[in-house]
């Protein structure tokens, strides 16, 4: 499948959007009924199957969030309709994944939970595309989304690039008008600054273990 994408020319936003939709289209059959989980295949993870399926759901947002952040007038009618279909799928997934009464609830967090990593994709997507992923929610759905995401402020987070995941969540809260933790933001920024090694490089919690996530988040 990868072969057909090699050598593809990307010269415009529409080209990038078309490639993204082409890449994620094969995933559609693997979403759960409530769209909160994506089970693309069985593989070994140390953090449990539920978190793995939530990870699958969230990682696609690194592409969809930027896609929805603005209009793509040069896209064909069919691709615009497909982008809209993805919007509805992800709204449904967020609503069900953050609802404790739903069978596809993503679950409560514990200290150093893998789901904290996936919160970054959700936070960035909502920050870039609030009209798609935040404003359509009703009051109760917004409350549940906030409560689920806010769990990251109440649990231990590894003293490495994971702190930027919490920074991104609190930044999102500020942007959409939700309560946010200034204390956590300051604490996490101090940890990130403590990872700086010079010349633009940060380490991932251990001296000399250079990191690529932090500059990406910046």
Predicted ranges, named:
Residues 1-55, 88-93:
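Low-complexity, Ser/Thr/Pro/Gly-enriched N-terminal "stalk/linker" regions
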Residues 2-9, 42, 76, 104, ...:
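Generic, low-specificity signal for short hydrophobic/alpha-helical stretches with a mild N-terminal bias
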Residues 53, 64-67, 83-218:
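Aromatic-lined, polymer-binding surfaces characteristic
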Residues 61-74:
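HEAT-repeat alpha-solenoid elements in large eukaryotic scaffold proteins
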Residues 33-36, 73, 158:
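Intrinsically disordered or highly flexible coil/loop and linker segments, enriched in small
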Residues 76-82:
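Short coil/linker segments at helix-helix boundaries
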């Amino acid at each position: 499948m990868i072969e057909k994408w090699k050598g593809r020319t990307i010269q415009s936003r529409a080209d990038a959007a078309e490639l993204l939709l082409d890449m994620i289209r094969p995933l559609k059959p693997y979403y759960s009924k409530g769209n909160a989980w994506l089970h693309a295949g069985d593989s070994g993870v140390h953090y449990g199957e539920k978190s793995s399926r939530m990870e699958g759901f969230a990682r696609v947002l690194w592409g969809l969030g930027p896609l929805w952040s603005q209009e793509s007038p040069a896209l064909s009618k069919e691709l615009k309709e497909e982008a809209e279909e993805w919007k509805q799928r992800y709204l449904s997934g967020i609503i069900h994944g953050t609802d404790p009464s739903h069978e596809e609830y993503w679950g409560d967090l514990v200290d150093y939970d893998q789901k904290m990593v996936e919160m970054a994709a959700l936070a960035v997507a909502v920050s870039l595309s609030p009209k798609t992923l935040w404003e359509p929610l009703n009051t109760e759905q917004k409350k549940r989304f906030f409560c689920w995401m806010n769990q990251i402020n109440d649990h231990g987070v590894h003293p490495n690039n994971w702190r930027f995941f919490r920074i991104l969540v609190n930044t999102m809260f500020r942007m959409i008008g939700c309560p946010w933790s200034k204390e956590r933001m300051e604490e996490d920024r101090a940890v990130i600054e403590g990872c700086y090694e010079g010349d633009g490089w940060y380490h991932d919690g251990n001296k000399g273990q250079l990191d690529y996530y932090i500059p990406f988040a910046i």
